[in-house]
Amino acid sequence: MDASPKYTGVRKRKWGKWVAEIRLPNSRDRIWLGSFDSAEKAARAFDAALYCLRGPGARFNFPDNPPEIPGGRSLTPQQIQVVASRFACEEELLPPEQHHPSPPRGDHNTEEEVIISARGEINSGSGGPTLGQVGEDNNNEGNSNDTSSYWPLIWEEENFVGPPNSDHEFGFFTDDSTNLYFPTQQQQQHQLSSDFYYDGACEDDFSHYNINLWNF
């Protein structure tokens, strides 16, 4: 009696090899997936082909370790045959927790330290560009479409993977943005000059009013 496991889409040949094939949806045509030296490899080839035809919600031979094939739903039968055979031979059958390992703790701490360091540089003004300088660079760029040159911190925020709520370390939320704004020297001079001309205009208006007052 054969005690080998039974998998969907898998058959054993008389000479000991395991073969896999899958039928196309709403058709009698089948896709030959190949011949393998173990039932598990043949079953994984079937799962890969099933993913391409039915999607991630199909009933796989290994539901705890389903395949993930980018763009699999748009492949032709010939491409499915190649992808399924390659997936069965290259992908080892691992438990789910080993299939998607978590990042080492040391790297996690290093990334967190980099974020804290970046925030300190923004607050002290000794490191990268302040938000005022970033805005000034934005005006100087004109109609340039390359935003990575004057928005480096936004780029790091979108690409960083870190602990929960790590975005707050960058201070780009509405509640924290006012605490990180530093006016540039040009903006300060512009504000002082605006106040000067405003006071001058007021003095001229009052002096003119006084002259007309005594001019009966």
Curated annotation (Swiss-Prot):
Biological process, per Gene Ontology: ethylene-activated signaling pathway
One Pfam assignment: AP2
InterPro entries, A to Z: AP2/ERF_dom (IPR001471), AP2/ERF_dom_sf (IPR036955), AP2/ERF_TF_ERF_subfamily (IPR051032), DNA-bd_dom_sf (IPR016177)
Compartments (UniProt record): Nucleus
Biased composition range(s): Low complexity: 135-145
Gene Ontology terms: cellular component: nucleus
Chain positions covered by the region annotation Disordered: 121-145
DNA-binding region, residue range(s): 6-63
GO molecular function: DNA binding; DNA-binding transcription factor activity
Principal location listed in the UniProt entry: nucleus
Keyword annotations of the record: Activator, DNA-binding, Ethylene signaling pathway, Nucleus, Transcription, Transcription regulation
Protein task: Probably acts as a transcriptional activator. Binds to the GCC-box pathogenesis-related promoter element. May be involved in the regulation of gene expression by stress factors and by components of stress signal transduction pathways.
Family assignment from sequence similarity: Belongs to the AP2/ERF transcription factor family. ERF subfamily.
Protein name: Ethylene-responsive transcription factor ERF016
